[in-house]
Amino acid sequence: MYKKQLIIIFLFLFFISYAQTEFITLWKPNVNGTIDNSITFGGTGTSYTISWEEVGYPQHSGLMNSVTSNSSSPITISFGTSLNTNPLQATYKLKVSNGSGLFYGFRASPDYINPNANLELTEISQWGDIIWLQQFNTAFAGCPNLNVTASDTPNLTQINNLSQMFFNCSSLAGNNSFSNWNTSTITNMNGMFSRAKLFNQNIGTWNTANVTDFSGMFSFAAAFNQNISGWNTAAGTNFSVMFKDAVAFNQPLNSWNTKNATNLRYVFSNAAAFNQPLNNWNTSKVTSFEYMFENAVSFNQPIGNWDVSKVSSFAGFNMFNGALLFDQDISTWNIKLQNFAGNSMSFGFKNSGLSCTNYSNFLIALNNNPAWANSTITSGNIDATGLVYSTPQAIMARAQLVNKGFTIIGDSYNSGCFLSTVETSKKITTPAYPNPTTGVITVESTENENVYVYDITGKIIKNMTLNKGKNSIDLTGYPSGNYLLKGNHIFTKIIKK
C-alpha cells in the first residue's frame, strides 16, 4: 500500500512538473468607449482551450473547449455583463492552452497597418510553453495599449520571422525578460520595434547570426538606446531605415560585420543623437546610401575609407542633406560612374556641415574621376545649399561638371576659405547656457557673426546676428528636440527640453 502511494505521488509530481503553462493576456473590451464586452481573438489552432475571468471578479468566468480557429478570421469572445461598476474599465484575463489539440499562432488584427487596429489587448503576462509554429510577423502590430510584463520568454525555435512583431506598439516598455529571448532561428527582424516609442530593453545578447533583414527594426523607436555592438550581423543584407528617427540612439556599431550589406538607405536618417565611428564597416556590396545620414544632426565621423564602388542608383549618394555637423573628406571615394545605367546621378549636401575645403576637394575629385571615359552619365544633381567652394581648381571643376550636365544649386564662391587650417581655427564651439534649455538660452560669441538656428530636419527656424559678447536666443515657442546654431565660424548644439 505504501509503495502504491509513493508511485501515485511520483506520477502526480511528474505530471505537475510537465503541466502545461498557458499563453496569458489581458484585454479591455470597452476601451473604445462602446460597451459591448466582447473581443476578437486572432488565435490559430485546432481543438485548443480558452479560459477567461474578469479581473477583480473571479466568479465571472468562462471556459471554451475544442476551439478551432485561424488568425486570418478571428473568433469573437463575448464576456456577457461585466461585474465592474465601471464597465468601461472592465478587464479580462485570457488563458490559452493546447487543450486536446494544438494552439500555435496568434495575430492581434489582420489590419496591422492601422496603428489602432486592436485597442483592447493591453498585456502579455505569460508566454507559456506554447511552441509557436505560425510566424510572428505583424503578430501584435497595431496594439497601441499593449505592454509585455511576462517574466518568461516565447518559444521561437520553430519560426524565423519576427518582422513588424511590435509595429506601432506605442505603449510597449517591456521588461528585462527580453534579454533572454532565443532568436537563433530568426532571419527577419524587419520593423520589429518600429514605432515602439517606449521600448528600451537590453537585447544586446540576442543571437542574430541568421538575420538577413534588419531594415526598419528600430525606426521611430524614440527611446531605444541600448548597446547592440555584440550582434552578429554577418548575414545581414538589408539595414535600410534601421535607426531612422531613433532620436535617442547613440551606441557603438563599428564592430558590426557588414560584408554582405547591400542596402543602407535611410539607416541613420533623423537619428539626431547618433555620432559613432563607422570606419570599419565593409560597404563593398552596397548599392545605395540614399539619405543614409539625412538630418543626422550630430554625425561627424570619418568615412572616407568606405568602398562605394557598387553604388548604382540615381540617388545612391544623396545622403548628407541636413547633416549639420558632418565635415569629413570623401574625395577619396572610388565612385564608379559607369555603374549608373540611368545616365544620371545625384549628391545631397544641403545644409550639411561640409567645409569649404572638403566641398572643394569633392568637386575636384568628382570632376577628375577617371571613370568619366567609360561613363554614360549626361546629367546629375548636386544640392550644395549653404556650402562654399574656393581655389582655382574647385572653380574649374565646378564649371566642368556643369558642362557635363550637372545642375549644382545653393553653393557660393569664397576666395578666402581655401586653407583647412584656417577653417579649423575659425570654427569655434560657442558657449551656450543653460543647455539643455526650457526656452531662452545665452550664447557667448567672440565676434559679430551672422548665424542660423536649424531644427532636426535641417530647416532654418531663426536667423540673426550675434554680437560680440553675450546674446539671448528665445526658443520658448519651439518644440522639444535638438537644434543647431551655425554660422561661418561658429556652431553649437542646443537641446530644448
Which role does the model predict for each range below?
Residues 4-5, 226, 233, 239, ...:
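N-terminal cationic leader/targeting segments used for protein routing and processing
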Residues 5, 26, 428-432:
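A generic hydrophobic-helix recognition signal that picks specific residues
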Residues 14, 154-157, 434-436, 445:
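Proline-rich low-complexity regions
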Residues 20-418:
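Negatively charged
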Residues 13-15, 402, 426:
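Short, structurally constrained coil/turn elements
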Residues 1-22, 421, 484-487:
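Bacterial Sec-dependent N-terminal signal peptides
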Residues 5, 394-395, 435:
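Alpha-helix initiation and N-capping motif
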Residues 424-497:
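C-terminal outer-membrane/trafficking sorting elements
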